[in-house]
Each structure stands twice: as C-alpha cells, then as structure tokens.
Amino acid sequence: YAEEALQHALTAGAVAAAVQIVARYRCELTNEEQWQRLDRWVRLFPPEVSGREPELLLAEVWFMINRQHLAGIPPLLDRVEAVLAQGAIEAATARRLLGEVEIRRATLYFYAGDHVRSLTAAAAALEKVPVEWWLLRAQARLFLSAGYQAQGDLERAYATLYAVDEPAQGLAAQMRLLVDACFIHWMAGDLGGVIQAATQILTHSDELGSQVETITWARYHLAACHFARNELAEAERLLALNIRQRYQSHMQCYVNGAAALALTYEVQGQTDKAREVVAQMVAYTLEIGGAVGHAAAKAFEAELSLRQGRLAEAVNWAEQSDVPLTIPRPLFYRPPVTLAKILLAQNTPASRQQAGQVLAQFHHYAASIHHTSVVIEVLATEALLYSLEDRQEAALTALEQALALAEAGRFIRVFVDLGEPLARLLAKLGHAWGNSPFIARILAAFPQTVPPADARRLANTALLSPLSARELDVLALLSQHYTDNEIAAKLVITADTVHSHVQHIAQKLGVRGRRTIVQTAKDQGLLE
C-alpha cells in the first residue's frame, strides 16, 4: 500500500506528499532492515528532490553504508546538516535526523580508525534518536561499544550492549544488539561469547521474519568461529547459506563470509570450489561497486593464490596494492597479514625485512586498540618470520604469546594455516608448556597439511613426557579394544608388562581409565 501511494503521489506531482510517505514509513522499514526497499523508493524521486530532502538523503546513506560506498557519504551528510541548519524542519524531527547523521559519522570515523570521534558521535546520537528507532540506536551502541573496547574497557563495552536501560522494543531489537555483541566478542578474541550470541539469534530465526541482515550476520559470526576452531563442516554449512543471500547482506558480511568459505574448501582439498567462490566474490564486488569491498576481494584473491602455489599472482597484487596498516580489521579477513605472508613466501632478506615492518606496525596498532583476535594472528605470523630468520628464541616467544591469547577461545586454524614450520615450533614449545592439551589439539589438526604419521609424532613430542615407541604401540592396540592378554600376544610381551605400559601412558596423559586414555590420546593427536 505504501509503495503504491508513493507512486500515485509522484505521478500526480505531489512531491511533498511523497516525501512525507517515505518519512512516515522510514522508521518501520529501518527497523525491519529494509534498506534495499528504501533505496528503491528514493530512486523514484527526481534527483533534484532526493538530493535536498534529509529523509531521502539519509535513506541513501544507509544503502551506501551497507554496500560500503563510503567515499560518497560525507557530502550527503554535509548536505543534510546544511538543510537542518536552515531551521525549517520541526525541532523534534530535526533532532532525530541530526542523531542519524551522527551515527553515520560514527561509522565513518570507526572505519578510518578514529575511535575517539566515533565513540563521541555515537554517544551524541543516542541522546537524540528516539527509542522507537531501535535499529539506529543499536547501530550507535555498536560504535559506542567498539570505542570502549578500543580503550581497553571491555566491561563497559559489553554493558553498552547487554545492560541496556531503556524500554524493551521486542525480540528483533534484542537480537540486533546480540549481533553487535558478536563483533565485540570477536575483536576481544572471545569465540565462546560469539558462539553464544550468534546461536541465540539463530535459535529465533523463524521469528525474525524480514530481519535478513541480522540472520546473515549471525550465521557469518558463528561460521567464523567454527572455522577458527577447525570445525569445518559446520562452517561450510552456514557460509554456503549466506553467500546465496549476498544481495541482501551487508557487503562486509558477504566478503568476509565468502573468504571464510573459500578457505574452508581450500583446507579440505576442494581447490576448484575455493577458486569459484573467490571468482564470484570479485565479480560481485565489481558489479555492486565501491572501492572497499573490491579491494578486500582482490586482497583475498591474492591470499588464495599464495595458498595454491601461484606466488607470481600473489606478488603482483602485493606490489600494486597499498594496504592500510592502521585501520581496524574487526572481521574474519585481514589483508595486512596476506601482504606479510606473501613477502615471507618470497623469502629474500629484503622481503623478510619488509614483512617484519608490516607485521610490527599492524601488531602495534591492533594491540593499541585491544583487538586480540588480530594480535593472535600477527604474533603467529611473526613467529613464522623469526623461524625463517633462524631466530628460534624470538619465534618461540612470539608463538607462546599467541597461544596464551588463543587458548581461551580455542583458536586452531590460525596456527595450522601457517604450515609445517609452525608445527615444528609448536612441538618444541610443548616441552616448555608441559602436557598441554591445547598445543596437542592444534598439532592434531595438522594432518591436513602434514602426513598423519608426522602429525602424531609432533603431537607426542609436545607432551611433557613423550610416550615411548612401545607405549605408542600399546596405545594403538588399546584404541582397537584389545585386552591386556591380546596386546601381550600381539607384541610378544607379558600381560604384566602391558599393564605397566598402560599405567605409564595414563600418568603421562594425566588421566585414569582405558576409555579416557584413548579419548584423550585422540584429542591430543596421538591417534587417528
């Protein structure tokens, strides 16, 4: 009905009435995440009208935010502020529109790395935007929370989203705040928090109706965690759903999700599928336009080229690209790390020096804004650099720091994807850490890039007291449910000796009972 009324008004030349129709429904459509529908409405107006009306301009800005056409946004916001400064718009409406302008400026400040101004603008927006415009308020709270997180005040960051002291606006509003929380948990390296929030959203997906953006963000966040923990089947399932809804998704949600899906295929040996996803990503970002999405797609194209052994293609991107190192990278894919890995793959003194400079600058920035998930990846990559330079002590120190940050969230793939050199470092570090289930779990994931026998050997060396060859033989037969007498016959030893070996295995693994021994050995990569 509303769209029909809008078209009738425009056909009749009643432009002011048409603008009022958009204004009347914009709150509802905004809360329902109907940014594409609003954009269609705006395009029905002549450019001279859409270019001067704040309601239409801000609808266009929202569309541009979701498509990541960021460069064109500031002039539109300036135009809105100029109209509001004339004082012709009713005071309450003008205040709400100004609050929306401040939300969009908070967004731009965040992407530019200016967290202080982003936080300030978001706080000002919350003072102006009415509670019934709850999606706008949720967006303001995201950047307010991110500002606190960048200052290291994680408690206040979470309180901004989880302890909202204002009238409840329903399930969809609550779920949108959980989407915001996913971003903060991810940046803080708290995969468990992301999983809890995203799972809660998806539990209510049938009730959320038109909230496609909320659902796609939740799927993306959950899948990113599954990939990080090497739970590839579930990551693939969620991401495959998302890329089918790319036209309804935020550009960053699509690009980062497609990157994660391509890697999920790649690490499972499905290289053709990985290339198909990346080709689609590059084509889509060209179709939609906007430098931000396309730059990320091309960077990830180079990442995949590197992983698939096409170093010349990857180097070509690295030599032609200017990758900013001091802007936030709050999502799955981080182009600065790709740049560093390409330089490391070239493995010349000059390229290693340049890689070190990239990693050091990116590390310093990420640490300064408390983006723990980024710091984990950078530290692991720095460990690889130091290993290439035969600086073993520095390599082990960097890796130990990465593991200390990664263990609570159970990050796995960030280490595995750096290959066998990191597996060797992990095995060495295992001796210093003692009987570390976390290191063993990471080493157990290496068979995708390391032969299974080598992976089991590395997992064993990570134990404080590695199992002897005979103990490994006994363990293998235990896993096949052999009795002591059967093991004794198989290995040509006495049953008492078998019993002694089992006790020693249990002591070294820190567990009791045969079933627990076998399960722990599997978890730690000692058994297939």
Residue map of PLM features:
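Regulatory hinge/linker segments at domain boundaries
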Residues: 444-476
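Extended alpha-helical scaffolding segments used for macromolecular assembly and cargo binding
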Residues: 1-67, 72-76, 354
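TPR/TPR-like (Sel1-like) alpha-helical repeat modules
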Residues: 13-15, 78-83, 393-410, 420, ...
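Recognition helix of helix-turn-helix DNA-binding domains
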Residues: 473, 481-516, 520
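TPR-repeat structural position
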Residues: 2, 15, 35, 70, ...
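Amphipathic alpha-helical segments of tetratricopeptide repeats
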Residues: 6, 26-27, 39-47, 78-90, ...
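Tandem amphipathic alpha-helical repeat scaffolds
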Residues: 19-28, 55-70, 97-113, 135-153, ...
